[in-house]
């Protein structure tokens, strides 16, 4: 069993499938209060798949995952991946390649869709044509899925939506595995309110890719809390496409328009934060715990946490890319004809720079960084 996966905390949702015979009758499971909060927040978010989840804390569980294919026959899985825009994405891809390996009894058809919706639809149609056994999709955007999902269903191929969410009715896919990005946005804003303790915030937001549920969720969650703070002002919010180059470009243009007017930069992933830091450095703007500008980031990848440990990023909200083991567990249950969870949330936490203590986040240490493999 994969060690990393053992450390995942899952919230398993009740969400019974409308499809006869699909879904689990098990109680939802959670290990921490934070995980229960995650579920409750998801239930508030209309655009998200976990809206079906029921917040009920119960038994403890860890992700029993990456156990390998026990059916005795090779299982052919297609994975339509978003692209390779970020360190998070690279880690997610590697995790799928490790879990769905030939040694584990799988044949993985992996397509890097390079953030192109049309390419992603084409990839899924290719999987249908090849009559693969299971299709996994990390959807670039929330919209536009109904037709192709209907095609997969007509072909009798089970579909698992992973990482991000879609707008389609949940009768059109079989399971969903991912993180609650709205809750990540709420955590970031709650931490900021705690840190500022009533002081003014003039905020610039570097959003992720347009139309991605990770962008929509983080924005919605952050804005919901921001709306309760009359002392906060969001000066501007632009997409940096989840890339370092995008983050740098947006930050350079923000500096031109708002130099001297902002004290908070929210980057919706670590790579954007790296680009934003480069742009601020070049403009002699100081940031981090000893600087003039507070930086908030998302993902908490190894390098992002290194910057957090160094005090350059004040707060980094985790998003766990290690999800393939959970997807494999669902596929193994489907193959065995057993019950499985229709919706599985992979839990996230948040980290803050040394010297900061928070009710919403863990203070970074060398040990935490040493334990972060991706
Ligand atoms: O935060 C970002 C990636 O969908 C949660 O996509 C994922 C996001 C992640 O490119 O780095």
Residue ranges and their predicted role:
Residues 18-33:
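Bacterial lipoprotein signal-peptidase II cleavage site
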Residues 64-66, 73-75, 206, 210-214, ...:
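Hinge/cleft segment of the Venus flytrap/periplasmic-binding protein
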Residues 70-73, 77, 120, 176-202, ...:
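Hydrophobic alpha-helical segments within soluble ligand-binding/sensing domains
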Residues 75-103, 108-126, 130-132, 138-142, ...:
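Extracytoplasmic "Venus flytrap"
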Residues 88-102, 106, 184-191, 213-232, ...:
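Short, solvent-exposed amphipathic alpha-helices that sit
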Residues 110-112, 168-191, 205-206, 237, ...:
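Short beta-strand elements at the ligand-binding edges of bilobed clamshell
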Residues 128-129, 133, 137-154, 222, ...:
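Hydrophobic alpha-helical
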Residues 145-183, 202, 208, 301-307:
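Flexible loop/hinge segments that line or gate small-molecule binding clefts
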């Amino acid at each position: 069993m994969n060690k990393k996966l053992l450390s995942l905390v899952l919230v398993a949702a009740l969400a019974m499938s409308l499809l006869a015979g699909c879904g689990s009758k098990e109680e939802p499971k959670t290990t921490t209060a934070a995980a229960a909060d995650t579920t409750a927040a998801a239930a508030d978010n209309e655009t998200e798949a976990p809206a079906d989840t029921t917040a009920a804390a119960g038994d403890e569980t860890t992700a029993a995952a990456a156990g390998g294919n026990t059916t005795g026959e090779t299982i052919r899985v297609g994975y339509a991946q978003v692209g390779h825009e970020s360190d998070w994405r690279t880690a997610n891809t590697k995790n799928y390649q490790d879990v769905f390996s030939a040694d584990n009894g799988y044949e993985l058809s992996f397509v890097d869709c390079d953030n192109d919706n049309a390419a992603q639809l084409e990839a899924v149609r290719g999987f249908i044509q090849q009559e693969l056994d299971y299709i996994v999709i990390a959807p670039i955007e929330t919209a536009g899925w109904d037709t192709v999902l209907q095609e997969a269903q007509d072909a009798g191929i089970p579909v698992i939506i992973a990482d991000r969410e879609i707008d389609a009715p949940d009768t059109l896919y079989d399971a969903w595995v991912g993180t609650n990005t709205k809750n990540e946005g709420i955590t970031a804003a709650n931490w900021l309110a705690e840190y500022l303790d009533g002081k003014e915030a003039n905020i610039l937001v570097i959003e992720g890719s347009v139309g991605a549920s990770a962008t929509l969720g983080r924005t919605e969650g952050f804005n919901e809390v921001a709306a309760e703070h009359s002392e906060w002002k969001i000066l501007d919010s632009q997409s940096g496409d989840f890339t370092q180059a995008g983050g740098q470009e947006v930050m350079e243009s923000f500096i031109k328009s708002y130099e001297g007017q902002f004290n908070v930069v929210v980057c919706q992933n670590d790579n954007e934060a790296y680009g934003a830091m480069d742009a601020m450095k070049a403009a002699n703007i100081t940031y981090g715990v000893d600087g003039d500008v507070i930086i908030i980031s998302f993902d908490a990848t190894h390098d992002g946490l290194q910057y957090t440990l160094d005090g350059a990023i004040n707060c980094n909200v985790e998003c766990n890319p290690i999800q393939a083991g959970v997807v494999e567990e669902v596929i193994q249950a489907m193959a065995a004809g057993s019950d499985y969870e229709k919706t599985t949330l992979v839990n996230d936490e948040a980290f803050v720079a040394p010297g900061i203590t928070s009710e919403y986040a863990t203070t970074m240490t060398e040990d935490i960084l040493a334990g972060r493999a991706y």
